[in-house]
Swiss-Prot record:
Cellular component GO terms held in the UniProt record: mitochondrion
Enzyme class: hydrolase
Lineage, broadest ranks: Eukaryota, Metazoa, Ecdysozoa, Arthropoda, Hexapoda
Protein name: Protein phosphatase PTC7 homolog fig
InterPro entries: PPM-type-like_dom_sf (IPR036457), PPM-type_phosphatase-like_dom (IPR001932), PPTC7 (IPR039123)
Length: 320
């Protein structure tokens, strides 16, 4: 994500010395990692549907130490959580403009996902409102004794097992797809203030409580969709959607012969690898290049190098 921050002069002065002393590597480094999420073996009805989930991602720049363990791909973050009542997953994309003032742009996204994941383990959480989960997670983050300064988009999805209904909340330009029988059944809609300036949750510095883009979690678009066994649910940051057309994404997903854990991981890996390849292609007419032209924004064309995070899940039912 490339978003310009405005009206932060005091913050800029505070961190300018850090920026002068920082050493930046100019070579490009990408990292691929995957994770399989198995259904819980206890705490739920043996007849309830569940999600088999794979996570893949690439960071476009050198990783921070311990990034993989911290569930980060560059400035993106994610989480997957299972409870007796629901399956939950989320992605967040830290606003890159904070790098210009010496702030780790990915930390805010990581801490937001950590708070949302923690909220799923609280009593009373039933997975029927992804937006309420986002609200609760953001409130927890903003009430920390030591503020985590930054901004990020967020996309959360919860599947209530008994109802087999997917509840989503999307704020910004990350998003989700529901695929059934080879076709996109539902797709999220971007929320943007302007071209390449998505809605974003923000915690400003203590001395700058007025902020330029301080959107509220209540502004997230909330949807619900009935799911069937075999449906695919995909969550991703804009590093995927800005570089890969929907038709190309479907071609890869429709090539999955099975929906087992390793099959999903292989499919997710293929999607991420292809998106990364397209992001580095200077002549490919990417979705990002097309949007730039539609907004009369000068852009030479090609993909948009960015962090990519993808969660791919399949709806399954226990075998008798």
């Amino acid at each position: 994500m490339i978003t310009h921050l405005k009206n932060w002069p005091r913050l800029l002065n505070r961190f300018v010395l850090q920026l002068k002393n920082a050493r930046h590597s100019i070579h490009q480094f990408t990292h691929l990692a995957g994770r399989l999420q198995r259904p819980p073996k206890s705490g739920k009805s043996s007849r309830d549907p569940y999600l088999v989930t794979a996570v893949q991602g690439r960071s476009k720049k050198p990783r921070y130490p311990g990034e993989r363990a911290n569930q980060r791909f560059g400035e993106d973050s994610w989480f997957v959580s299972s409870t007796p009542l629901a399956e939950v997953m989320g992605v967040a994309d830290g606003v890159g403009g904070w790098r210009d003032v010496g702030v780790d742009a990915g930390r805010f996204a990581k801490e937001l996902m950590t708070c949302c994941s923690g909220q799923t383990q609280r009593s009373g959480f039933d997975g029927r409102s992804a937006r309420n989960l986002l609200i609760a997670g953001f409130q927890e983050l903003t009430h920390r004794e030591q503020p985590v300064v930054g901004s990020s988009t967020a996309c959360l999805a919860t599947m209530h097992r008994r109802d087999c209904i997917l509840y989503t909340a999307n704020l910004g330009d990350s998003g989700f797809l529901v695929v059934r029988n080879g076709r996109v059944l539902h797709r999220s809609v971007e929320q943007t203030h302007d071209f390449n300036t998505p809605y974003q949750l923000t915690v400003p510095p203590a001395d700058r409580q007025d902020c330029y883009y301080c959107d509220k979690p209540e502004m997230a678009v909330s949807t619900r969709h009935s799911l069937l066994p075999g449906d695919l649910v995909l969550l991703a940051t804009d590093g995927l959607f800005d570089n890969m057309p929907e038709s190309m994404l479907l071609k890869i997903l429709n090539g999955l012969k099975e929906r087992g854990e390793r099959d999903l991981l292989q499919g997710a890996s293929q999607v991420v690898e292809k998106a990364r390849e397209l992001s580095l292609n200077a002549t490919f007419q990417s979705p990002f290049a097309i949007k730039a032209r539609q907004h009369n924004v000068p852009y030479s064309g090609g993909g948009k190098p960015d962090d990519i995070t993808l969660i791919l899940a399949s709806v399954e039912v226990p075998r008798a």
